C-alpha cells in the first residue's frame, strides 16, 4: 500500500460520469420523442437510469467524504470553487432565457400584433398563484438560513426541523406551479410568448425539483449524523443552490409575470 504525500483526493475510476451522460442523452432524446410521437418509453428509461446514477454517485461521494476522510480542507476548497462555477454557468443559462423574452417583448413584431403579450394570449394574473409562489420561495430562503445557523450552533434538532420546512415549501411550490400550468389558456407551442414562458419557468421549476432532491439527501444524511459545524459542505452547497433558485424566481416574477403581463 502506498501513502500519498499531498492533501488532494485521487479519485478511483468511476462509471457514474459515463452513465450520467448516457442517461442525460436518453432523457433529452426521450423528451423529443414524447413531444413529437407521444411516446414516453425512452424518457422513462433515461429518467430511471439518471435516478440510479444519482443514487450510486451520491453514495460514493458520501462514503469518500464522510467515512474515508478524503475531503480534506484543500479538497473542500476545490469543491467550493466548483460549486460557484456551476452556479455561474446556471446564471448564464437563465440569462439566455431572459434575453429571448426581452428581445421579443421590448419590440414586438407585426406577427405578434405589435403588442405584448401577443394578440390572443391571456397572461396569468401576477397577484394570484405567482405571488403565492414568491412568498413560498422567500419563506423557504428564511428556513434554509435557519437550518444553516442551527448547524453552525450544533443544534441538530432545529436544523432538521428547518430542513423539513424548506423541503415541504419546495414541494408545495412545485405543486402550485403544476396547477398553474394546468390552468393556463396557452401552451408552449403558442408562439414566442408560450415558448419563452414555459421554457424559463419550467427550467426554474426543474431547478426547484433538483434543489428539493438535494435537500432531501441532506436531511437523510443529517438523520445519520453526517454533518458537523466544521464538516458540512454537502449542505452548504445545497443552501447556495437554493438561494440561487430563490433569486432567479424573483427575476422571473418581476420580468415575466408582472412586467410581461
Swiss-Prot record:
- Name the Gene Ontology molecular function terms of this record: cytochrome-c oxidase activity
The record lists its disulfide bonds as none
- UniProt key word Heme: no
Give the protein name, as stated in the record. Answer: Cytochrome c oxidase subunit 3
Q: Where in the cell is it found?
A: Mitochondrion inner membrane
Protein's job: Component of the cytochrome c oxidase, the last enzyme in the mitochondrial electron transport chain which drives oxidative phosphorylation. The respiratory chain contains 3 multisubunit complexes succinate dehydrogenase (complex II, CII), ubiquinol-cytochrome c oxidoreductase (cytochrome b-c1 complex, complex III, CIII) and cytochrome c oxidase (complex IV, CIV), that cooperate to transfer electrons derived from NADH and succinate to molecular oxygen, creating an electrochemical gradient over the inner membrane that drives transmembrane transport and the ATP synthase.
Q: Pfam families from the entry?
A: COX3
Keyword Membrane listed: yes
Q: What is its EC number?
A: 7.1.1.9
Quote the catalytic activity from the record.
4 Fe(II)-[cytochrome c] + O2 + 8 H(+)(in) = 4 Fe(III)-[cytochrome c] + 2 H2O + 4 H(+)(out)
**Residue ranges, Mitochondrial intermembrane compartment?**
35-40, 106-128, 184-190, 257-261
The UniProt transmembrane annotation reads 16-34, 41-66, 73-105, 129-152, 156-183, 191-223, 233-256
The record's comment on protein family reads: Belongs to the cytochrome c oxidase subunit 3 family.
- What does the annotation say about its assembly with partners? Component of the cytochrome c oxidase (complex IV, CIV), a multisubunit enzyme composed of 14 subunits. The complex is composed of a catalytic core of 3 subunits MT-CO1, MT-CO2 and MT-CO3, encoded in the mitochondrial DNA, and 11 supernumerary subunits COX4I, COX5A, COX5B, COX6A, COX6B, COX6C, COX7A, COX7B, COX7C, COX8 and NDUFA4, which are encoded in the nuclear genome.
The record's GO CC annotations read: mitochondrial inner membrane; mitochondrion; respiratory chain complex IV
State the organism named in the record: Canis lupus familiaris
Q: Which CDD domains match?
A: Cyt_c_Oxidase_III
Keywords noted in UniProt: Membrane, Mitochondrion, Mitochondrion inner membrane, Translocase, Transmembrane, Transmembrane helix
Amino acid at each position: 500500500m502506498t501513502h500519498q504525500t499531498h492533501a488532494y483526493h485521487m479519485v478511483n475510476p468511476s462509471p457514474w460520469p459515463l452513465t450520467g451522460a448516457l442517461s442525460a442523452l436518453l432523457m433529452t432524446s426521450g423528451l423529443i420523442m414524447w413531444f413529437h410521437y407521444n411516446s414516453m418509453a425512452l424518457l422513462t428509461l433515461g429518467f430511471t437510469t439518471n435516478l440510479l446514477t444519482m443514487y450510486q454517485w451520491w453514495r460514493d461521494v458520501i462514503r469518500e467524504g464522510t467515512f474515508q476522510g478524503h475531503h480534506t480542507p484543500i479538497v473542500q476548497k476545490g469543491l467550493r470553487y466548483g460549486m460557484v462555477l456551476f452556479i455561474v454557468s446556471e446564471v448564464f443559462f437563465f440569462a439566455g432565457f431572459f434575453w429571448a423574452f426581452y428581445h421579443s417583448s421590448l419590440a414586438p413584431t407585426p406577427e405578434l400584433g405589435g403588442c405584448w403579450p401577443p394578440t390572443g394570449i391571456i397572461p396569468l394574473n401576477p397577484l394570484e398563484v405567482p405571488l403565492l409562489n414568491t412568498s413560498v420561495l422567500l419563506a423557504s430562503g428564511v428556513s434554509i438560513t435557519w437550518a444553516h445557523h442551527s448547524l453552525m450552533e450544533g443544534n441538530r434538532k432545529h436544523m432538521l426541523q428547518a430542513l423539513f420546512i424548506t423541503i415541504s415549501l419546495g414541494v408545495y411550490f412545485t405543486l402550485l406551479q403544476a396547477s398553474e400550468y394546468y390552468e393556463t389558456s396557452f401552451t408552449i407551442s403558442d408562439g414566442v410568448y408560450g415558448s419563452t414562458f414555459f421554457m424559463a419557468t419550467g427550467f426554474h421549476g426543474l431547478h426547484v425539483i433538483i434543489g428539493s432532491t438535494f435537500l432531501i439527501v441532506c436531511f437523510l444524511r443529517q438523520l445519520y449524523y453526517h454533518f458537523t459545524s466544521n464538516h458540512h459542505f454537502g449542505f452548504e452547497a445545497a443552501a447556495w443552490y437554493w438561494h440561487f433558485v430563490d433569486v432567479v424566481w424573483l427575476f422571473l416574477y418581476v420580468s415575466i409575470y408582472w412586467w410581461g403581463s
